[in-house]
Amino acid sequence: MTMSENSRNLEAGLLLRKNQNDINECRITAVVLFSTFVSVCGSFCFGCAAGYSSVAQTGIINDLGLSVAQYSMFGSIMTFGGMIGAIFSGKVADLMGRKGTMWFAQIFCIFGWVAVALAKDSMWLDIGRLSTGFAVGLLSYVIPVYIAEITPKHVRGAFVFANQLMQSCGLSLFYVIGNFVHWRNLALIGLIPCALQVVTLFFIPESPRLLGKWGHEKECRASLQSLRGDDADISEEANTIKETMILFDEGPKSRVMDLFQRRYAPSVVIGVGLMLLQQLSGSSGLMYYVGSVFDKGGFPSSIGSMILAVIMIPKALLGLILVEKMGRRPLLLASTGGMCFFSLLLSFSFCFRSYGMLDELTPIFTCIGVVGFISSFAVGMGGLPWIIMSEIFPMNVKVSAGTLVTLANWSFGWIVAFAYNFMLEWNASGTFLIFFTICGAGIVFIYAMVPETKGRTLEDIQASLTDFLQ
């Protein structure tokens, strides 16, 4: 055999191995699909909880005689509970595991729905809502992290975006059935996805990256093998995880203050900045009190909620498709641009209405503005910050970073949700003008700071950001 023939055989062998690795990376197994479905049952719970306060407002106020301030507390206290959950989310997810954390969260979610369903006064309403908020605070961190850690890199964005899709499904479901079901029965319906996740969690594998971090190499490989398929060659991916964990183990243990080192600054600024933009754009307040916005704009809230329910799921599906085709960065820019435009439209609509101008058109403008804003949010800004958060932090600081980023999200979400009704009473047009300005600033921030992470391994993304300022 000649040297040239040996060379060709070697090249053919290397090409065959590369193609086999590519096939393994591209494979989407039934285990990955089922594991993702089980985890996003928690996202569905989140969506149901977020939509509940809007459709239940009239019934609860009439039955229990709550004031606007009392109901604002009930509506917003879920975000305060989420803030508490966020403080513990990273540590709990590392100590109990991703699966254990989801199971633990559902205990509080189930208690919360039962407390709301049986409440006789505002105190039990608030306790139940606070408990549900604590649960979704834990879930909002652990679900995208778990999905990012189990999925192949080429579909990671789409699978993590299923988190936002299922939130939209839960929100849409409650927007629809809330018009026909008593608020107590609606709370009991919220128990169904909680129970479904509790049962199905027993049948999915733990995150292989977390098992690797714990030093359970055998269990890590077994989990990875089940996720990639029995006949898949997982050696390269398993070795990458092992090498990364060894590198992190050799360094000092992570503390919150470590996040303020120069090497982690880009990741922290991007993660926290996107969460602040998501909340300060007014998205949470609008979804919690969308009925009030429709009524104030002269559009029937029951019809508006139904329109939203029909539109939100296709828009979230569109985002799931586009996240791997367009990439994270372009989709974020398009989504924030849409939110910016529709905030301005709502500002003009309420301004015209306050001066008695275009009385026949302002309700239509309000409907278009609300539906357009929430649709734009669902396509990108609703889910992408969580995707990027799950990608940009190395395992050695993921606990501290995840806690900080999730805490920032829920803290500002609580402020916006609590103040939203009061801001609308103060000046509806001015309120949406403020949100327009924030969305405009967000476009500049995304363009200047947020990198594209599509199609890259977690280790590659994290290394590039860590070395950015070195």
Swiss-Prot record:
CDD domains: MFS_GLUT6_8_Class3_like. InterPro entries: MFS_dom, MFS_ERD6/Tret1-like, MFS_sugar_transport-like, MFS_trans_sf, MFS_Trehalose_Transporter, Sugar/inositol_transpt, Sugar_transporter_CS. Its main location: membrane. Disruption phenotype: No effect on the root lengths compared to those of wild-type plant under high salinity conditions. It is a multi-pass membrane protein. Keywords: Membrane, Stress response, Sugar transport, Transmembrane, Transmembrane helix, Transport, Vacuole. It is found in: Vacuole membrane; Vesicle. Expressed in both shoots and roots. In roots, strongly expressed in pericycle and xylem parenchyma cells, and to a lesser extent in the root endodermis. In flowers, expressed in sepals. The keyword Transmembrane applies. The chain crosses the membrane at residues 28-48, 68-88, 99-119, 130-150, 157-177, 186-206, 268-288, 303-323, 332-352, 368-388, 404-424, 430-450. One of its GO terms (biological process) is response to water deprivation. GO terms for cellular component: plant-type vacuole membrane; vesicle. One of its GO terms (molecular function) is monosaccharide transmembrane transporter activity. The keyword Transmembrane helix applies. It comes from the Eukaryota. Induction: By drought and high salinity conditions, and with exogenous application of abscisic acid (ABA), with high expression after 5 hour exposure to these conditions. Expression in roots is higher than that in leaves upon the high salinity and ABA treatment likewise as it is under normal conditions. A motif (Essential for the localization to the vacuole membrane) lies at residues 10-16. Pfam families: Sugar_tr. Belongs to the major facilitator superfamily. Sugar transporter (TC 2.A.1.1) family. Sugar transporter. Transports monosaccharides across the vacuolar membrane independently from a proton gradient. May function coordinately with the vacuolar invertase to regulate osmotic pressure by affecting the accumulation of sugar in the cells under abiotic stress conditions. The N-terminal sequence motif LXXXLL is necessary for localization to the vacuole membrane (tonoplast). This is Sugar transporter ESL1. It comes from Arabidopsis thaliana. The lineage of its organism: Eukaryota, Viridiplantae, Streptophyta, Embryophyta, Tracheophyta.
